[in-house]
A protein has these predicted regions:
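Enzymes that bind and transform nitrogen-containing heteroaromatic metabolites
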Residues: 2-242
Length: 242
C-alpha cells in the first residue's frame, strides 16, 4: 500500500515530480543536452508510472510546453458578461491538465492537451484563475471547452487551499503531479502541500540564470523512501515527514 492510498485530506495527494540538474536547477538549456537524453526519458517513464489523475504547471511552464505563446483573438467576446463562477466544460473527463494561470493569459486552442505521451495527451484543461479575469477570456474558454475555477483575489493572490479543495471536490482529482515551474513549486512547498518529492537527476550542472527546484522555499523535512537507477539516471523518491 502506498502513501496516497491512506491519504485522508480534502485535497489531492501532491507529488512534485521534476527533472533536476546536479546543482538543483529545473529549467535551462541542459534539458536539451544529448548527455541528458536518457535521464529526460527516465523522467517521462516515472511520470507514466505514477499514473496521476492530473498534472499541474504554472503559466510559464504551460506556455512553453503546450500553448507555445498563442494569443487568441478575444474581440468577438468583448462586451459579454460572465458571472465569476466555476465552470466545468466536460463532466466526463477523468484526466486533467491543471494550469495555474492567475490572470488568465494562456492561449489554449482547445480543451484537451494534444501530445503523444500518454502521461500528458488527452488531458482535459482546467484553468485556476483569480478573481478579476476579463469576462471575454472566460467566454473564450467556454467556447473552446476549457474548464476553470476561481481560487484567489483580484490582487492576484492565489488561495492554494481553495484551489486544491475545488480540484478534489469538483473534478475528483485524488493524485496530482506538480511539475513546475519553480515559482509554483515554491508556493506549494511554502504552504506544506507537497506530500511526496520525485526527482530524476540530470548528469550536468545548470547555468547561473536557470531556476531552482523551489523559488523562495521554507524549511521542511522529507524522508527517502526509494532510490534506483532508471536509464542510468538516479531517481529519488521522498515523502513528507508529518
Amino acid at each position: 500500500m502506498t502513501r496516497e492510498d491512506t491519504f485522508e485530506m480534502p485535497r489531492p495527494y501532491v507529488i512534485c515530480h521534476m527533472g533536476m540538474s546536479l546543482d538543483g536547477k529545473v529549467t535551462g538549456d541542459f534539458l536539451s543536452l544529448t548527455q541528458c537524453a536518457a535521464a529526460v526519458d527516465a523522467y517521462y517513464q516515472v511520470n507514466r508510472r505514477y499514473a496521476g489523475d492530473a498534472f499541474a504547471c504554472g503559466r510559464v511552464t504551460m506556455e512553453g510546453s503546450f500553448t507555445q505563446g498563442f494569443q487568441p483573438d478575444l474581440t468577438p467576446y468583448q462586451g459579454r458578461t460572465v458571472p465569476p463562477m466555476d465552470y466545468v466544460a466536460d463532466e466526463t473527463a477523468t484526466f486533467f491538465a491543471v494550469a495555474f494561470d492567475r490572470r488568465g493569459r494562456l492561449g489554449w486552442q482547445c480543451g484537451r492537451i494534444e501530445d503523444e505521451d500518454p502521461g500528458y495527451g488527452n488531458a482535459h484543461v482546467v484553468e485556476v484563475l483569480c478573481e478579476g479575469v476579463a469576462p471575454e477570456y472566460l467566454c473564450y474558454l467556454q467556447h473552446i471547452g476549457v474548464s476553470y475555477i476561481f481560487a484567489g483575489n483580484e490582487a492576484g493572490v492565489l488561495d492554494l487551499d481553495l484551489a486544491l479543495f475545488k480540484l478534489r471536490r469538483i473534478f475528483g482529482i485524488k493524485k496530482l503531479l506538480l511539475e513546475g515551474g519553480s515559482i509554483l513549486n515554491g508556493a506549494f512547498q511554502r504552504e506544506d502541500k507537497i506530500d511526496e518529492l520525485s526527482l530524476v537527476i540530470m548528469p550536468c550542472v545548470g547555468e547561473e540564470q536557470d531556476k531552482p527546484l523551489f523559488w523562495q522555499s521554507a524549511l521542511s523535512e522529507y524522508q527517502l523512501e526509494e532510490s534506483r537507477l532508471i536509464n542510468g539516471a538516479p531517481w529519488l523518491r521522498y515523502v513528507r515527514k508529518r
